[in-house]
Amino acid sequence: MLLCDRAFAGADTLATSYALSLAIKRLCPDFVFCGRQSVDGDTGQVGPSLAVRLGFSLVTNVMSLESAENGLFYTDRLGNGGNISAPAVITLEKSRKLRLPSIRSKIKPIEILSANDINADISLCGLKGSPTR
């Protein structure tokens, strides 16, 4: 899934998490994985904001994950660990080696969604929905 619309241009983390949360709700995932930072910022706010908007549990700065009986067992960057059950947003501390995509993912078309497709309030998207400038 790819969100692509001029309405999303100039978004800060608040507007970004708003648009992403609407798209994620369409998928009904058990877990949402986020990085610690983006290429254009280092605030670390999108993952936690998504958790709030989605009403999911949140674990941040995760270094490792393992399957557990009732969800996932995580270890964070301080060496603390615990279990987290679905639904949850998990922010990962370090980049991982990318695995080669499966053949199915190579040929599956990417669904492109606009602000209208996710029923977004345009006043909350992009530069219009960004209190930081």
Name each model feature, range by range.
Residues M1-R133:
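N-terminal glycine-rich FAD/FM-binding segment characteristic of electron-transfer flavoproteins
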